């Protein structure tokens, strides 16, 4: 991917509040030009060999390939999940 190429980054978060917090920080630091927050989604996943269902929120961040690594690092640093879906 070329450094100036635009990309969308999909991030699940525990709730709308966490999504707003992350969105504000990444836009403030200019790691994303824009953030769209969907306040409620239903996630279905396999955890420890059991199917789990959980309410979450999702962020869609608009950024560039050049900013992606810094964006990902910041999200990992401030996200409440041990291994966030980015």
Map each language-model feature to its residues.
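Positively charged, small/polar-rich N-terminal and surface patches that mediate targeting and assembly
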Residues: 1-86
């Amino acid at each position: 991917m070329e450094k100036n190429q635009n990309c969308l980054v999909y991030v699940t978060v525990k709730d709308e509040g966490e999504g707003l917090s992350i969105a504000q920080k990444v836009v403030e630091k200019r790691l994303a030009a824009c953030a769209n927050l969907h306040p409620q989604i239903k996630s279905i996943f396999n955890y420890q060999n059991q199917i789990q269902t959980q309410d979450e929120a999702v962020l869609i961040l608009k950024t560039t390939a050049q900013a992606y690594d810094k964006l990902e690092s910041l999200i990992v640093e401030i996200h409440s999940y041990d291994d966030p879906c980015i």
